[in-house]
Amino acid sequence: MLQKLRNSTFVAIVLAARGTLLICCLLLFCYLLFSTLTNTFLIPTNDLLGDVASILKGELWRVITSTVYFSEWTPLIKTVLIVLVLCPFIEWKIGSPVLVMSFFASSWIGILLFCFGFGGIIRSTVGINTYVYAFYGGTLSVYALFPLAVLAFLIKKPAFSLLAKCVLVGGLLLYFTVGFWPSSDTPEPAVIVQISQLCGGLSGLFCALIIVALRNWKKVPFFSTKPSN
Protein backbone atom coordinates (compact mmCIF):
# COMPACT_ATOMS: atom_id res chain seq x y z
CA MET A 1 0.00 0.00 0.00
CA LEU A 2 2.78 2.39 0.93
CA GLN A 3 4.66 1.46 -2.23
CA LYS A 4 1.60 2.27 -4.35
CA LEU A 5 1.28 5.58 -2.54
CA ARG A 6 4.92 6.42 -3.22
CA ASN A 7 4.53 5.55 -6.88
CA SER A 8 1.30 7.51 -7.39
CA THR A 9 1.45 10.47 -9.73
CA PHE A 10 -0.44 12.71 -7.32
CA VAL A 11 2.10 12.19 -4.53
CA ALA A 12 4.93 12.76 -7.01
CA ILE A 13 3.32 16.04 -8.08
CA VAL A 14 3.03 17.23 -4.48
CA LEU A 15 6.59 16.23 -3.56
CA ALA A 16 8.01 17.91 -6.67
CA ALA A 17 6.29 21.25 -6.03
CA ARG A 18 9.44 23.11 -5.05
CA GLY A 19 8.65 26.12 -7.22
CA THR A 20 5.18 26.37 -5.71
CA LEU A 21 6.68 26.28 -2.22
CA LEU A 22 9.18 28.96 -3.20
CA ILE A 23 6.42 31.28 -4.46
CA CYS A 24 4.39 30.85 -1.27
CA CYS A 25 7.43 31.37 0.96
CA LEU A 26 8.39 34.52 -0.95
CA LEU A 27 4.88 35.96 -0.61
CA LEU A 28 4.74 35.19 3.12
CA PHE A 29 8.27 36.49 3.72
CA CYS A 30 7.57 39.73 1.86
CA TYR A 31 4.32 40.15 3.81
CA LEU A 32 6.24 39.94 7.09
CA LEU A 33 9.04 42.14 5.76
CA PHE A 34 6.78 44.90 4.48
CA SER A 35 4.59 44.68 7.59
CA THR A 36 7.71 45.39 9.63
CA LEU A 37 8.65 48.29 7.38
CA THR A 38 5.19 49.86 7.53
CA ASN A 39 4.49 49.25 11.23
CA THR A 40 7.95 49.68 12.77
CA PHE A 41 9.63 52.14 10.42
CA LEU A 42 6.33 53.83 9.49
CA ILE A 43 6.87 53.63 5.75
CA PRO A 44 3.58 54.65 4.06
CA THR A 45 1.64 51.71 2.65
CA ASN A 46 0.84 53.59 -0.55
CA ASP A 47 4.57 53.76 -1.33
CA LEU A 48 4.63 49.98 -1.78
CA LEU A 49 1.32 49.19 -3.46
CA GLY A 50 0.69 49.33 -7.17
CA ASP A 51 -0.74 52.72 -8.03
CA VAL A 52 -2.03 53.40 -11.53
CA ALA A 53 -1.40 57.14 -11.47
CA SER A 54 2.11 56.76 -10.04
CA ILE A 55 3.10 54.04 -12.51
CA LEU A 56 1.83 56.15 -15.40
CA LYS A 57 4.09 58.94 -14.11
CA GLY A 58 7.11 56.64 -14.37
CA GLU A 59 7.37 55.07 -10.90
CA LEU A 60 7.94 51.64 -12.41
CA TRP A 61 9.49 50.21 -9.23
CA ARG A 62 5.93 49.85 -7.98
CA VAL A 63 5.49 47.10 -10.56
CA ILE A 64 7.96 44.98 -8.57
CA THR A 65 6.81 45.81 -5.03
CA SER A 66 3.10 45.43 -5.77
CA THR A 67 3.69 41.86 -6.94
CA VAL A 68 4.93 40.65 -3.54
CA TYR A 69 3.32 43.17 -1.16
CA PHE A 70 -0.03 42.65 0.52
CA SER A 71 -1.17 45.14 3.13
CA GLU A 72 -3.97 42.84 4.31
CA TRP A 73 -3.97 39.19 5.37
CA THR A 74 -7.13 38.10 3.50
CA PRO A 75 -5.99 38.71 -0.12
CA LEU A 76 -2.63 37.14 0.72
CA ILE A 77 -4.26 33.96 2.04
CA LYS A 78 -6.53 33.74 -1.02
CA THR A 79 -3.53 34.09 -3.32
CA VAL A 80 -1.45 31.50 -1.43
CA LEU A 81 -4.40 29.08 -1.32
CA ILE A 82 -4.93 29.18 -5.08
CA VAL A 83 -1.19 28.90 -5.70
CA LEU A 84 -1.00 25.80 -3.48
CA VAL A 85 -3.93 24.19 -5.28
CA LEU A 86 -3.07 24.90 -8.92
CA CYS A 87 0.65 25.53 -9.22
CA PRO A 88 1.90 22.00 -8.35
CA PHE A 89 0.07 20.61 -11.40
CA ILE A 90 1.35 23.38 -13.65
CA GLU A 91 4.86 22.89 -12.26
CA TRP A 92 4.68 19.14 -12.95
CA LYS A 93 4.28 19.88 -16.66
CA ILE A 94 6.44 22.97 -17.25
CA GLY A 95 9.08 22.71 -14.50
CA SER A 96 9.90 24.69 -11.37
CA PRO A 97 12.02 27.50 -12.90
CA VAL A 98 9.47 28.17 -15.64
CA LEU A 99 6.60 28.25 -13.13
CA VAL A 100 8.34 30.76 -10.86
CA MET A 101 9.35 32.99 -13.77
CA SER A 102 5.86 32.78 -15.30
CA PHE A 103 4.18 33.67 -12.00
CA PHE A 104 6.12 36.88 -11.50
CA ALA A 105 6.43 37.78 -15.19
CA SER A 106 2.66 37.48 -15.64
CA SER A 107 2.19 39.86 -12.72
CA TRP A 108 4.55 42.45 -14.19
CA ILE A 109 3.04 42.16 -17.67
CA GLY A 110 -0.48 42.33 -16.24
CA ILE A 111 0.35 45.43 -14.20
CA LEU A 112 1.83 47.25 -17.19
CA LEU A 113 -1.17 46.29 -19.32
CA PHE A 114 -3.55 47.31 -16.54
CA CYS A 115 -1.94 50.74 -16.19
CA PHE A 116 -0.80 51.66 -19.69
CA GLY A 117 -3.39 49.73 -21.68
CA PHE A 118 -6.52 50.44 -19.65
CA GLY A 119 -5.49 53.44 -17.54
CA GLY A 120 -7.59 55.81 -19.64
CA ILE A 121 -10.66 53.58 -19.42
CA ILE A 122 -10.25 53.24 -15.66
CA ARG A 123 -9.89 56.98 -15.23
CA SER A 124 -12.96 57.76 -17.34
CA THR A 125 -15.00 55.10 -15.53
CA VAL A 126 -14.45 56.01 -11.89
CA GLY A 127 -13.21 59.58 -12.12
CA ILE A 128 -9.87 61.32 -12.18
CA ASN A 129 -9.71 61.90 -8.42
CA THR A 130 -10.70 58.45 -7.19
CA TYR A 131 -9.63 55.97 -9.82
CA VAL A 132 -7.89 52.93 -8.38
CA TYR A 133 -5.73 54.17 -5.59
CA ALA A 134 -3.89 50.87 -5.32
CA PHE A 135 -3.97 47.23 -6.35
CA TYR A 136 -2.13 43.97 -5.68
CA GLY A 137 0.06 42.71 -8.50
CA GLY A 138 0.03 39.22 -7.02
CA THR A 139 -3.70 39.02 -7.69
CA LEU A 140 -3.05 39.46 -11.41
CA SER A 141 -0.74 36.44 -11.23
CA VAL A 142 -3.63 34.44 -9.79
CA TYR A 143 -5.78 35.36 -12.78
CA ALA A 144 -2.90 34.35 -15.05
CA LEU A 145 -2.88 30.81 -13.65
CA PHE A 146 -5.95 29.79 -15.68
CA PRO A 147 -4.21 29.82 -19.11
CA LEU A 148 -1.22 28.07 -17.54
CA ALA A 149 -3.50 25.40 -16.03
CA VAL A 150 -5.09 24.84 -19.44
CA LEU A 151 -1.60 24.49 -20.89
CA ALA A 152 -0.80 21.88 -18.23
CA PHE A 153 -3.83 19.89 -19.37
CA LEU A 154 -2.76 20.10 -23.02
CA ILE A 155 0.83 18.98 -22.45
CA LYS A 156 0.71 15.19 -22.75
CA LYS A 157 3.90 14.18 -20.93
CA PRO A 158 4.31 13.56 -18.07
CA ALA A 159 0.73 12.32 -17.91
CA PHE A 160 -1.71 13.11 -15.09
CA SER A 161 -3.32 10.27 -13.19
CA LEU A 162 -7.10 10.19 -12.74
CA LEU A 163 -6.74 11.43 -9.16
CA ALA A 164 -4.50 14.29 -10.28
CA LYS A 165 -7.00 15.29 -12.96
CA CYS A 166 -9.86 15.27 -10.43
CA VAL A 167 -7.89 17.40 -7.98
CA LEU A 168 -6.90 19.83 -10.73
CA VAL A 169 -10.51 20.18 -11.90
CA GLY A 170 -11.56 20.76 -8.29
CA GLY A 171 -8.79 23.33 -7.97
CA LEU A 172 -10.05 25.15 -11.06
CA LEU A 173 -13.55 25.26 -9.56
CA LEU A 174 -12.08 26.68 -6.35
CA TYR A 175 -10.06 29.08 -8.48
CA PHE A 176 -13.17 30.46 -10.18
CA THR A 177 -15.06 30.64 -6.88
CA VAL A 178 -12.34 32.47 -4.96
CA GLY A 179 -10.55 34.30 -7.74
CA PHE A 180 -13.19 35.24 -10.29
CA TRP A 181 -16.52 35.19 -8.47
CA PRO A 182 -17.39 38.81 -7.59
CA SER A 183 -17.34 39.63 -3.89
CA SER A 184 -20.18 41.71 -2.48
CA ASP A 185 -17.90 43.58 -0.06
CA THR A 186 -15.20 44.51 -2.55
CA PRO A 187 -14.62 48.29 -2.68
CA GLU A 188 -13.63 48.30 -6.35
CA PRO A 189 -16.20 48.93 -9.10
CA ALA A 190 -17.11 45.82 -11.09
CA VAL A 191 -15.46 47.18 -14.25
CA ILE A 192 -12.12 47.47 -12.42
CA VAL A 193 -12.30 43.85 -11.30
CA GLN A 194 -13.17 42.77 -14.84
CA ILE A 195 -10.26 44.73 -16.29
CA SER A 196 -7.83 43.22 -13.78
CA GLN A 197 -9.12 39.74 -14.61
CA LEU A 198 -8.69 40.46 -18.32
CA CYS A 199 -5.15 41.77 -17.84
CA GLY A 200 -4.19 38.79 -15.70
CA GLY A 201 -5.69 36.35 -18.19
CA LEU A 202 -3.95 37.99 -21.14
CA SER A 203 -0.60 38.02 -19.36
CA GLY A 204 -1.03 34.35 -18.48
CA LEU A 205 -1.93 33.57 -22.09
CA PHE A 206 1.16 35.43 -23.27
CA CYS A 207 3.37 33.42 -20.90
CA ALA A 208 1.70 30.19 -22.02
CA LEU A 209 2.38 31.01 -25.68
CA ILE A 210 6.02 31.79 -24.88
CA ILE A 211 6.34 28.44 -23.08
CA VAL A 212 4.81 26.60 -26.04
CA ALA A 213 7.12 28.41 -28.45
CA LEU A 214 10.22 27.59 -26.40
CA ARG A 215 9.20 23.94 -26.05
CA ASN A 216 8.64 23.54 -29.78
CA TRP A 217 11.07 25.93 -31.43
CA LYS A 218 13.44 23.11 -32.42
CA LYS A 219 10.58 21.46 -34.32
CA VAL A 220 10.25 24.49 -36.60
CA PRO A 221 12.18 23.86 -39.83
CA PHE A 222 13.74 27.32 -39.72
CA PHE A 223 15.41 26.59 -36.36
CA SER A 224 16.18 22.93 -36.93
CA THR A 225 19.75 21.90 -37.68
CA LYS A 226 20.36 21.53 -41.38
CA PRO A 227 22.14 18.36 -42.44
CA SER A 228 25.68 18.94 -43.57
CA ASN A 229 26.63 17.96 -47.09
Regions found by a protein language model. Name each.
Residues 22-31, 81-84, 91-145, 167-178:
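Small-polar-interrupted transmembrane alpha-helices in polytopic inner-membrane proteins
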Residues 31-102, 118, 187-192, 196:
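N-terminal TM1-TM2 helical hairpin plus the immediately adjacent luminal interfacial "cap"
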Residues 38, 118-122, 155, 182:
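Short helix-capping/hinge motifs at transmembrane helix termini and TM-loop junctions
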Residues 73-75, 130-151, 195-199:
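Membrane-interface loop-to-helix entry segments
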Residues 90-93, 150-157, 206-215:
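Structural signal for the C-terminal ends of transmembrane alpha-helices
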Residues 151-171:
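Membrane-helix boundary/juxtamembrane motif in polytopic membrane proteins
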